[in-house]
């Protein structure tokens, strides 16, 4: 039974609504909601994932910016379960306050135009997030899960993998959406690491080091990091200054960032 409704996609909001039952079911199976968990969906759209999750779990919080979707979501959800709708820009939502002591599980078909800001916003609240299941452009998922030496290994890869276990799950073709996007999508799972195991002394400095390293990725680290690292830092962190950012493991960036400035 599918309770999703029809609504026009708004290009300005980067909307592409999932419509293929096979992929909807695969996402719900990947999330596998259990009793007592606090599920939060970002951008429910026409309810393709919303209503199967609600039917399986009984309660769901959704964050939707498009006011035209609020009434139909509310109406369609009424006979299924308890749907709580937050009508706001997701980047303004305080996930820590929303969790209210219970870890939240984030789910969503993220708008292509703001997927990276949403990822970093969720990362800021990783301490209260149990896991995340997101659908994004495949190229973004490839970057998220990439390892050292890959052409797509970069700032996004390091920043996310420093704080989360990242697993690309499966590809979703354009034909599964209405309207179809021009590129493949993919579903990814992120599980925040135990804060006690994330040995980053200063998150801002870590971000600065990673940003500088990949900002000039063709340069050696000695040159790319000249504004944030001194020569002695490389020796202290046991990192070769003649290497390039794409050759470093996540742990190498963490060690570099953790070296105390002279």
Swiss-Prot record:
S-adenosyl-L-methionine binds at residues 16, 18, 43, 64, 89, 109. The lineage of its organism: Bacteria, Pseudomonadati, Pseudomonadota, Gammaproteobacteria, Lysobacterales. Keywords: Cytoplasm, Methyltransferase, RNA-binding, rRNA processing, S-adenosyl-L-methionine, Transferase. Its main location: cytoplasm. Specifically dimethylates two adjacent adenosines (A1518 and A1519) in the loop of a conserved hairpin near the 3'-end of 16S rRNA in the 30S particle. May play a critical role in biogenesis of 30S subunits. It catalyses: adenosine(1518)/adenosine(1519) in 16S rRNA + 4 S-adenosyl-L-methionine = N(6)-dimethyladenosine(1518)/N(6)-dimethyladenosine(1519) in 16S rRNA + 4 S-adenosyl-L-homocysteine + 4 H(+). Pfam families: RrnaAD. It comes from Xanthomonas oryzae pv. oryzae (strain KACC10331 / KXO85). This is Ribosomal RNA small subunit methyltransferase A.
